[in-house]
Amino acid sequence: MIKRMLMVAMLVIAPLATAVAADMSNPYQVMNEAAKKTFDRLKREQPQIRQNPDHLRDVVDQELLPYVQVKYAGALVLGRYYKEATPAQREAYFAAFREYLKQAYGQALAMYHGQTYQVAPEKPLGDATIVPIRVTIIDPNGRPPVRLDFQWRKNTQSGNWQAYDMIAEGVSMITTKQNEWSDLLRTKGIDGLTEQLKSISKQKITLDEKK
């Protein structure tokens, strides 16, 4: 259940990325403006995606990752192992983590079949540097709506906001990956996880034909 929601959630995480014209100092505006642009692109490029599902990697790389705090999220996943890693190990890990996200997010976008969304009304940001924004995913085939809380973090230097985590039914995506990879980190360290991420990132993206 959690895995399904995490995958569906990426259909909303991806929209966070395309709003070049959006006000990056306001996470609500970025989410609302970018959502429409990304869903329009998914609709428009379906012929190309169906011919080559791995095209979704390019969509993720171009439209999503610039607006996700990849290194911050990756460091949270590592936990204490981040401090123990050498600069070279960190560099290799973040490169592998980025490629992993391209595959994982691309596979999530392959689930697109007409979902819509509702973003919670904007609230005053005040001095907050971490802001959760509730998004409800509505399925056209009558499945129950999925409620997700996206975690946004403000860059104190640039003032820009970026997404770094998502919580579904009280479960954080960061926490889920920490638990999933904890044994590997304990036994093989960051190098072992880096190699696994490289392996996962090579998997082909397959389309979800369920309608």
Residue ranges and their predicted role:
Residues 136-138, 151, 194:
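Low-complexity, acidic/polar, glycine-enriched regions of mature
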Residues 16-23:
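Sec/Tat signal peptide C-region and signal peptidase I cleavage site
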Residues 145-175:
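Short beta-strand edge/turn micro-motifs at domain boundaries
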Residues 24-105:
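Early exported N-terminus immediately downstream of N-terminal targeting peptides
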Residues 165-211:
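Low-complexity, intrinsically disordered terminal/linker segments enriched in charged
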Residues 8-15:
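Bacterial N-terminal signal peptides
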Residues 103-146, 200-211:
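Surface-exposed, charged secondary-structure patches
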Residues 1-4:
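Positively charged n-region of N-terminal signal peptides that target proteins for export
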